[in-house]
């Protein structure tokens, strides 16, 4: 057993008491991102090593792997703790998103180590979608690069409000305060293009040597701020969904017998309590909450993030994908929306195409009306394009086959986040974040049906010699 873990269990008075203490610790999900070879995996390995989260057999295996695949000479190559795929180890890069768990006396952590290469943008977006904080690594020798800007943009696009700029490899610039100050100034200048409500912190460190990672560095007396671990342990995460109105997407209708009918799901935002008047959308039918059933019995109230089953006082028609909210809230269903899209397929996203989409348990079909622009994620400029390529990010106009109840993604990631599914292969080909739902009053009517637009796109793609015009060319 890990000696540090054994000591914690002994201090708590046994395994059961230790497990109870773990349940009451707060959990922080964060990701590491940066340019190639900035030391992301090494930093995670250092965090695991210095917080004594590595078992003896893992340490022994790490010694052997360092000799075979290591890049640090006689030293332990801590990056190998995270770079698990054979292809990653052979190339010395991170390809897939690697998740690791560790805990300290103050907090629990889930780390997502995301790829730095531009061709793996989709992997990074996947890792960032569940995180609350991003560690942006910058090589002290290179400063702020295009990939630093790209990762900052993707992180904020996916709703991350806390950025820790870790200026790594300070040992290779003689722990220069001037270098740290210059990079800090350069990043803050760039950050003026990002949303204004961000919490940005800077930590100079050396992941290889352990400076300012879990313990204060003696080599940088000019830095009096917290270590990286202290930042992670003390940062206050204010979840957006806690302050938002109630949203309960129905994932499953639970009917084990004739005497029970419940609606299971995870409360996406807000709170719900027994006796509360709720409304079902899109039908608009109202009822009262009779019971809130959980795995450990009935509760009087529930909060965002909790998996619950709601029992209503009335027998009404509710199915998977319906949304429950407070009865006094007016939330109109919309049939169009502008969506920030991260495209993940080899086949580009083009106007006129139709895809299945899934949002908060609801599955329907959407048509691409047009692409407003693609973002150059290296300098955040916008440019007009005919289609959105693999790993491209852009703002897209969608029309849905049926009215949907949507929130802006920055307000509610559950009811504002969607995925695109290819109708033939059933493969997820893209991720979308609702930028702005378009009400019926502002939506422009289309003179062409969904079938006509899809047929037009098919003809232009496969029979370009026919010279068919783009029916959406005027948009």
Curated annotation (Swiss-Prot):
With CysD forms the ATP sulfurylase (ATPS) that catalyzes the adenylation of sulfate producing adenosine 5'-phosphosulfate (APS) and diphosphate, the first enzymatic step in sulfur assimilation pathway. APS synthesis involves the formation of a high-energy phosphoric-sulfuric acid anhydride bond driven by GTP hydrolysis by CysN coupled to ATP hydrolysis by CysD. CDD domains: CysN_ATPS, CysN_NodQ_II, CysN_NoDQ_III. InterPro entries: CysN_GTP-bd (IPR041757), CysN_II (IPR044138), CysN_NoDQ_III (IPR044139), G_TR_CS (IPR031157), GTP-eEF1A_C (IPR054696), P-loop_NTPase (IPR027417), Small_GTP-bd (IPR005225), SO4_adenylTrfase_lsu (IPR011779). Keywords: ATP-binding, GTP-binding, Nucleotide-binding, Nucleotidyltransferase, Transferase. Residues 206-208 are annotated as: G5. Pathway: Sulfur metabolism; hydrogen sulfide biosynthesis; sulfite from sulfate: step 1/3. Heterodimer composed of CysD, the smaller subunit, and CysN. Pfam families: GTP-eEF1A_C (PF22594), GTP_EFTU (PF00009). Residues 34-41 are annotated as: G1. It catalyses: sulfate + ATP + H(+) = adenosine 5'-phosphosulfate + diphosphate. The keyword Lipid metabolism does not apply. GO terms for biological process: hydrogen sulfide biosynthetic process; sulfate assimilation. Its EC number is 2.7.7.4. Residues 168-171 are annotated as: G4. Residues 25-239 form the tr-type G domain. Residues 92-96 are annotated as: G2. Residues 113-116 are annotated as: G3. NCBIfam families: CysN (TIGR02034), PRK05124.1 (NF003478), small_GTP (TIGR00231). GO terms for molecular function: ATP binding; GTP binding; GTPase activity; sulfate adenylyltransferase (ATP) activity. It comes from the Bacteria. SUPFAM superfamilies: EF-Tu/eEF-1alpha/eIF2-gamma C-terminal domain (SSF50465), P-loop containing nucleoside triphosphate hydrolases (SSF52540), Translation proteins (SSF50447). Belongs to the TRAFAC class translation factor GTPase superfamily. Classic translation factor GTPase family. CysN/NodQ subfamily. This is Sulfate adenylyltransferase subunit 1. GTP binds at residues 34-41, 113-117, 168-171.
């Amino acid at each position: 057993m890990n000696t540090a873990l054994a000591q914690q269990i002994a201090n708590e008075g046994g395994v059961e008491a230790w497990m109870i203490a773990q349940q009451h610790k707060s959990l922080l999900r964060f990701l590491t991102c940066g340019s190639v070879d900035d030391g992301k995996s090494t930093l995670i390995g250092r965090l695991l090593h210095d917080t004594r989260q590595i078992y003896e057999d893992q340490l022994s295996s790490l010694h052997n792997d360092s000799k075979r695949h290591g890049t640090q000479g006689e030293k332990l190559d801590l990056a190998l703790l995270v770079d698990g795929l054979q292809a990653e180890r052979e190339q010395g890069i991170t390809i897939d998103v690697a998740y690791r768990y560790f805990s300290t006396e103050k907090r629990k952590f889930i780390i997502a180590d995301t790829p730095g290469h531009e061709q793996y943008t989709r992997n990074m977006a996947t890792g960032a979608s569940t995180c609350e904080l991003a560690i942006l690594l910058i090589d002290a020798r290179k400063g702020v690069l295009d990939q630093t800007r790209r990762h900052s943009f993707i992180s904020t696009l996916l709703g991350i409000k806390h950025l820790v700029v870790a200026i790594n490899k300070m040992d290779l610039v003689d722990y220069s305060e001037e270098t740290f100050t210059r990079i800090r100034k350069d990043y803050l200048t760039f950050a003026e293009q990002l949303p204004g409500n961000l919490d940005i912190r800077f930590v100079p460190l050396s992941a290889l040597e352990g400076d300012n990672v879990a313990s204060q560095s003696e080599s940088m007396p000019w830095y009096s701020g917290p270590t990286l671990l202290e930042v992670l342990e003390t940062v206050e995460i204010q979840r957006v969904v806690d302050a938002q109105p109630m949203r309960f997407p129905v994932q499953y209708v639970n009917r084990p017998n004739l005497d029970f009918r419940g609606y299971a799901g995870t409360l996406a935002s807000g709170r719900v309590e027994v006796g509360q008047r709720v409304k079902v959308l899109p039908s608009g039918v109202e009822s009262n909450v009779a019971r809130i059933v959980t795995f450990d019995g009935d509760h009087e109230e529930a909060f965002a993030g909790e998996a619950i089953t709601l029992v209503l006082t009335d027998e009404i028609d509710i199915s998977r994908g319906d949304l429950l909210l407070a009865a006094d809230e007016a939330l109109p269903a919309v049939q169009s929306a502008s969506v920030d899209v991260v495209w993940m397929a080899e086949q580009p996203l083009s106007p006129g195409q139709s895809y299945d989409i899934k949002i908060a348990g609801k599955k329907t079909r959407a048509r691409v009306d047009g692409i407003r622009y693609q973002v150059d994620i290296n300098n955040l400029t916008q440019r007009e394009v005919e289609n959105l390529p693999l790993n491209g990010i852009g703002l897209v106009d969608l029309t849905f086959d049926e009215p949907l109840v949507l929130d802006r993604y920055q307000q509610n990631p559950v009811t504002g986040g969607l995925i695109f599914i290819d109708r033939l292969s059933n493969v997820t080909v893209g991720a979308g974040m609702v930028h702005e739902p378009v009400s019926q009053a502002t939506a422009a009517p289309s003179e062409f049906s969904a079938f006509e637009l899809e047929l037009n796109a098919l003809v232009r793609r496969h029979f370009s010699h026919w010279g068919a015009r783009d029916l959406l060319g005027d948009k």
